[in-house]
Amino acid sequence: SAAGSFGNFGATTDNNAGNNLDTLFAGPRPDTASTDGVITKASVTWTPNDNQLLYATFSEGYRPGLLNRPGGATNPAGTFTVPYAIDTDDMTNYEFGWKTDLLDYTLRFNGSVFFAEIERLQTTIFDPSITNLFFSDNAADAEIKGVEGDFIWAPPSMSGLTVTGAFSVLDTEITRVITPTNDVTLGDSLAYA
């Protein structure tokens, strides 16, 4: 801003017209976030006949760690400090699924059931009592259970007609709270899941 850029012109201190960010957020601030490790994925498929395929999958995934702009900001009670860098969050997924052609290949029905565990879930938090900027933290552990499927039906008695549909049912839950905030509560569902 003009006050921050020119308000200190000729002043003997650099905090004459506003806040000196070096003083506000003093401390060891990393300038990089790095991640290393190994993730695995394994799948098994079985085709009992020409019309069916069954599969099972085990997979792992993660989102890399990241830096927080307002790292070092604290809440009024001094009990929480925004971390400068946050860790990866890790997901382990178990899935069983099927792909079928039924009724003389006029009905295709695909689906899956799955269970996923997330550790150290990265969450974006806005708490103006701490800072007026969004920040991220490893806020919780969570579980996701679900079933999903889709179908395509082309009845032979009605040439040109195709009926399609899909469904998805999710049950999500926060199983452990790591960051003390009102945005993340034990037992709540995951947002936008």
Describe the predicted segments one by one:
Residues 106-117, 135-193:
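Gram-negative outer-membrane beta-barrel transporters
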Residues 82-89, 123-125, 136-142, 178:
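Short, surface-exposed, polar/charged, turn-prone segments marking secondary-structure boundaries
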Residues 23-31, 79-85, 132-138, 182-192:
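Extracellular loop and loop/strand-boundary signature of outer-membrane beta-barrel proteins
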Residues 1-117:
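Structural signature of Gram-negative outer-membrane beta-barrels, strongest in the C-terminal barrel
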Residues 75-76, 89-93, 128-130, 141-145:
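Short C-terminal domain-edge/linker segments immediately following a structured domain
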Residues 2, 67-74, 79, 121-129, ...:
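Outer-membrane beta-barrel translocator domains and adjoining extracellular loop/strand segments
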Residues 10, 16-17, 70, 95, ...:
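Intrinsic disorder/low-complexity detector
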